[in-house]
């Protein structure tokens, strides 16, 4: 939800422009409240409203939201969608054309991440033109794994000896080239 504002922007969200000519607005009404966020462009843009959220590593989440579009035309971009920034394949289906409020969702695994950037994306790896509204963005925890890290140390066990050739190799040569022969361990 985008109901709380700070300095005219939704609390915790910020506009990002990847390719110029995007107009960012907080618009009324929203799908379920007084406000939604809007991105528009007449000349084509690749932009987003973005927020950083904390997640549990190795957990499954559902990212969902509602999008409304008017005259979205692709100029190389996918359309209007939600995605997890810099996480390949973590994106919803893209909307183009004109659509009333449409629910979209993505189920994903957080991997080893403990924080992720959610984007309300206008464009998607290329430009689109038109208008898009986003509202009721939710991130729901579905399930997770209990991590039980463990290590076994065999202090009395002798392993292979360190080779006499481990030093004097490429990395030390590189050190002489870069650090003028100064080497620290």
Language-model segment annotations:
Residues 166-171, 175-177:
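Structural recognition of the beta-strand scaffold that forms the well-ordered cores
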């Amino acid at each position: 939800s985008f109901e709380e504002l700070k300095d005219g922007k939704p609390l915790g969200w910020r506009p990002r422009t990847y390719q110029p000519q995007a107009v960012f607005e907080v618009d009324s009404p929203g799908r379920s409240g007084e406000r939604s966020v809007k991105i528009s462009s007449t000349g084509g843009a690749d932009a987003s409203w973005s927020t950083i959220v904390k997640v549990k590593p190795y957990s499954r989440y559902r990212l969902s939201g509602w999008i409304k579009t008017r005259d979205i035309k692709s100029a190389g971009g996918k359309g209007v969608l939600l995605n997890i920034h810099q996480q390949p394949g973590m994106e919803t289906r893209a909307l183009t054309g004109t659509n009333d409020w449409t629910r979209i969702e993505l189920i994903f695994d957080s991997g080893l991440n403990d924080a992720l950037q959610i984007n309300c994306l206008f464009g998607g790896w290329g430009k689109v033109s038109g208008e898009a509204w986003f509202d009721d963005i939710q991130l729901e925890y579905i399930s997770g794994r209990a991590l039980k890290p463990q290590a076994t140390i065999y202090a009395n066990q002798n392993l292979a000896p360190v080779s006499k050739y481990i030093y004097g190799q490429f990395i030390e040569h590189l050190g002489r080239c870069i650090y003028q022969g100064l080497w620290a361990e």
